[in-house]
């Protein structure tokens, strides 16, 4: 039993993060504190000063733990990371949490690649963005590819390395083939420097130079050449124009406001660049309840700017936010220069902030309308499903299973989960078939169902004994309905397995027609036809398509890995760890075969003798 009085008494007088848990060990709230002792004790004192949401949370707290940090800033960063990790019920949850795309230039490579990524990291490479307009970033990348024939492969190419055969991109003028030694590092970097200058928007010498070349070509009556240079100039100008929308400068500003109803809210952000509104984004925030606006916006700003590379100099908000000084310091450190959070009282900036709030209200109303419509459609489909199957209640949680193999090789099983009619990807599970030899789908299904419910019962017992936290369980939640991607045989196997464990869960099968389209449901060894186009047909089709897709994808990945491993296993001095490192670095047998001695030696765990063994194997 958790001793609250003792734990509250020994709380430290230091900054840190506290983690509240319910009786199942599930994390329900994460918070930061300047002084842990003072902040955590407040929750368990007079509840009259608490909001309704906080009172509800405190009732559910069965235990808490804390992490001491060296500073309040560290506590803020850790709080953001833990909220992302656990998605606690009582923390502010962004419904539309987005990771905006960046253009990444791998400047730590001899021959850099340029591509779009949603993962920003301090890894020594150059990033441009984030691009709040996803279409714009791909338009910019398309123009860059037209202008600059850069490599797109993931090969480890170093200057002076062993040349390899040029790929198709070289022959269609989309790559200069540094892999084959057709371009020097210095020449390649001239293109990279041009791209960086264009994306920075700081160097107009490129366009001036091209205009001179175009004029010269025209004077010499080389009109085709002049036209190509003109197209190049137009493309560069278009990139520069698009970049202006996303390059944060000294005078650039973001405007953030919030609109809430009795339960949820919408945060709206307007991006102002060079005095013009160039873009906007909205985020739905669920279960706000009666949380103060200053707390919600403070949490939103920490979350929104926590994963972005660029932060404006000034952020305007409707009122002073909680921990404003700390948040400003946090953003200043990320930006590298002073960031201000201000409250406009009158004038154009106040009017623009009012517009932001009005737009937030419109987006929240539209979102609610859409959610209600989607919820009603799913509820209607689940109600129809319950009627067809004769269930006493709606099957809120559905688990669907499928087997995939080719002639019994690399047999796998998969489980997908739908809750309230929507796919819940975080609960998907994959199984390698261990005990069944050859193509036997029935016994393979018996194995994965036995493993799933065996693990589930074990976890339930561990949770009861407090040896496992509910949030860490993978199989402890049981479904209201099981769907088998197959007919009578698969359904009967599932019923046998459940009976063996003493578990009562309804089971049905999903069958397809001769065109491989979902046709109906198998129940009690009889097929029930479902009307095409109905809400129920749409639901079971989504379930069947998803479990089949997940099974095929997993089987394909295992098959590819097995093919790679089977060849590498024949190479002397290359054990399991070295095989894994080679695959991680080169990605394919072909790339390993083409790798130079230097590239092989640069692979973790590969010494000179192992590298020589690889070269000898592929040259024989």
From Swiss-Prot:
Gene Ontology CC: cytoplasm; excinuclease repair complex
InterPro entries named among the record's database cross-references: DisA/LigA_HHH (IPR041663), GIY-YIG_endonuc (IPR000305), GIY-YIG_endonuc_sf (IPR035901), GIY-YIG_UvrC_Cho (IPR047296), RuvA_2-like (IPR010994), UVR_dom (IPR001943), UVR_dom_sf (IPR036876), UvrABC_protein_C (IPR050066)
Keyword RNA-binding: yes or no? Answer: no
A GO molecular function term, named singly, is: excinuclease ABC activity
How far does the signal peptide extend, from start to end residue? Answer: none
What SMART domains is this protein classified in?
A: GIYc
Gene Ontology biological process terms, A to Z: nucleotide-excision repair; SOS response
Where are the membrane-spanning stretches? none
- Entry's Pfam families? GIY-YIG (PF01541), HHH_2 (PF12826), UVR (PF02151), UvrC_RNaseH (PF22920), UvrC_RNaseH_dom (PF08459)
User: Where does it localize?
Assistant: Cytoplasm
UniProt-listed CDD domains: GIY-YIG_UvrC_Cho
**Keywords assigned by UniProt?**
Cytoplasm, DNA damage, DNA excision, DNA repair, Excision nuclease, SOS response
Chain ranges of the UVR domain: 204-239
The parts of the chain that form a coiled coil are none
Asked whether the keyword Ribosomal protein is assigned, the reply is no
- Domain GIY-YIG residues, every copy: 13-92
Q: Which family does it belong to?
A: Belongs to the UvrC family.
Oligomeric form and interacting partners: Interacts with UvrB in an incision complex.
Q: What does this protein do?
A: The UvrABC repair system catalyzes the recognition and processing of DNA lesions. UvrC both incises the 5' and 3' sides of the lesion. The N-terminal half is responsible for the 3' incision and the C-terminal half is responsible for the 5' incision.
Q: What is this protein called?
A: UvrABC system protein C
Q: Which organism is it from?
A: Clostridium perfringens (strain 13 / Type A)
Q: What is the lineage of its organism?
A: Bacteria, Bacillati, Bacillota, Clostridia, Eubacteriales
- What is the name of the gene encoding this protein? uvrC
């Amino acid at each position: 039993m958790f001793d609250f009085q003792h734990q509250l008494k020994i709380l430290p007088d230091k900054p840190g993060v506290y983690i509240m848990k319910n009786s199942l060990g599930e994390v329900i709230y994460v918070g930061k504190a300047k002084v842990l002792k003072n902040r955590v004790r407040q929750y368990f004192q007079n509840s009259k000063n608490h909001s309704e949401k906080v009172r509800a949370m405190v009732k559910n707290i069965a235990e808490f733990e804390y992490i001491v940090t060296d500073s309040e800033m560290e506590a803020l960063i850790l709080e953001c990371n833990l909220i992302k990790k656990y998605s606690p019920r009582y923390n502010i949850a962004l419904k539309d949490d987005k990771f905006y795309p960046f253009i990444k230039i791998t400047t730590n490579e001899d021959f850099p690649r340029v591509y779009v990524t949603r993962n920003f990291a301090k890894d020594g490479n150059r990033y441009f963005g984030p691009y709040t307009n996803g279409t714009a970033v791909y338009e910019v990348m398309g123009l860059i590819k037209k202008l600059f024939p850069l490599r797109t492969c993931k090969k480890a190419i170093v200057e002076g390395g062993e040349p390899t055969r040029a790929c198709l991109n070289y022959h269609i003028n989309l790559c200069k083939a540094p892999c084959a030694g057709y371009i020097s590092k210095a020449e390649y970097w001239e293109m990279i420097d041009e791209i960086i200058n264009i994306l920075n928007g700081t160097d107009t010498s490129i366009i001036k130079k091209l205009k001179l070349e175009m004029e010269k070509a025209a004077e010499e009556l080389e009109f085709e050449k002049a036209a190509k240079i003109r197209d190049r100039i137009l493309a560069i100008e278009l990139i520069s124009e698009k970049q202006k929308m996303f390059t944060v400068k000294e005078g650039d500003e973001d405007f953030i406001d919030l609109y809430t109803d009795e339960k949820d809210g919408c945060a709206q952000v307007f991006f102002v660049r060079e005095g013009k509104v160039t873009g906007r984004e909205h985020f739905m925030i669920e279960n706000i309840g009666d949380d103060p606006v200053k707390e919600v916006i403070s949490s939103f700003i920490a979350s929104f700017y926590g994963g972005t590379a660029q932060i404006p100099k000034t952020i305007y908000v409707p009122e002073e936010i909680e921990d404003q000084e700390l948040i400003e310091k946090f953003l200043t450190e990320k930006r590298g220069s002073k960031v201000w959070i201000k409250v406009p009282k009158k004038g154009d900036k106040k009017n623009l902030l009012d517009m932001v709030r009005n737009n937030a209200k419109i987006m929240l109303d539209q979102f609610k309308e859409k959610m209600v419509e989607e919820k009603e459609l799913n509820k209607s489909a689940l109600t129809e499903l319950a009627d067809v199957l004769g269930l006493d209640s709606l099957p809120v949680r559905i688990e669907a299973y499928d087997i995939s193999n080719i002639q019994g090789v690399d047999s796998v099983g998969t489980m997908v989960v739908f809750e309230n009619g929507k796919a819940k990807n975080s609960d998907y599970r994959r199984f390698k078939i261990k005990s069944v030899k050859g193509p036997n789908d029935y016994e393979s299904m018996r194995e994965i169902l036995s493993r799933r419910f065996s693990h589930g019962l074990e976890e339930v017992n561990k949770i009861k004994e407090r040896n496992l936290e509910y949030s860490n369980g993978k199989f402890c939640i049981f479904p209201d309905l099981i769907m088998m991607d197959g007919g009578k045989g698969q359904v009967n196997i599932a019923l046998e397995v459940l009976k063996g464990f003493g578990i009562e869960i309804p089971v049905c099968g999903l069958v397809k027609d001769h065109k491989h389209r979902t046709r109906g449901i198998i129940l009690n060894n009889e097929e029930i036809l479902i009307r095409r186009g109905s809400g129920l047909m749409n639901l079971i089709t989504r379930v069947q398509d998803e479990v089949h897709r997940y099974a095929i994808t997993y089987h394909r990945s295992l098959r590819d890995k097995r093919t790679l491993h089977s060849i590498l296993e024949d190479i002397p001095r290359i054990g399991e760890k070295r095989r894994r490192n080679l695959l991680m670095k080169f990605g394919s047998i072909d790339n390993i075969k083409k790798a130079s001695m230097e590239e092989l030696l640069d692979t973790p765990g590969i010494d000179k003798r192992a590298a020589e063994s690889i070269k000898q194997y592929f040259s024989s």
